[in-house]
Amino acid sequence: MVNLSSLAHRTGAIDFDDLQSTRSYRPWKAYCQSKLAMLMFALELQRRSNGAGWGLMSNAAHPGYARTELIANGPGAHGLLWRVNRLFQPYISQSAAEGALPTLFAATSPQAKPSGYYGPDGFYELKGPPAPAKIMPQAKDAAAAARLWDVSAMLTGVSFDSVPAAA
């Protein structure tokens, strides 16, 4: 199973007191939190699979800086970030198809590892061929990941408690 994260996980934090941003919604903060949560989910899913004998492989990937419409249509579109983006984009980004390669690597490569995280191998992981990516310390917090798992199960009504071990 591959979870799609982002370089934005690096500045993310899980706000357990306002997990769904109902008291204070800031788009970039919510995006960073969601991408951190996706990476934490991937790592926690692998821990739980290992412990329960589910026999699945969970990892994550990020596209680097792929040329999509995220910045053009997201918060602050046509602001300073958008103008800087337009200026430097040709030098620091890659096509959307190239951005998909780390996800394909994580899903199909025999070199992909459980609890692995993959992204572009270039400058600041912005572009380049797929390679192991840096996982920030907050994503490795097993206690926070377990708490997030439990809260997610409660909010969604989905539980994995009855999933049998792989035969």
Which residue ranges define each predicted feature?
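Short glycine/proline- and charge-enriched loop/turn segments
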Residues: 17-25, 78-86, 127-135
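Glycine-rich loops and low-complexity Gly/Arg-rich segments
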Residues: 25-29, 40-42, 83-87, 141-145
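C-terminal amphipathic/interface module of NAD(P)-dependent oxidoreductases
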Residues: 136-167
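Rossmann-fold NAD(P)H-dependent dehydrogenase/reductase core
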Residues: 1-78, 155-166
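Short, exposed beta-strand "edge-strand" segments with a Pro/Gly-rich flavor and a Y/T-containing core
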Residues: 11-15, 134-140
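C-terminal helical subdomain
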Residues: 34, 85-133, 140-146, 150
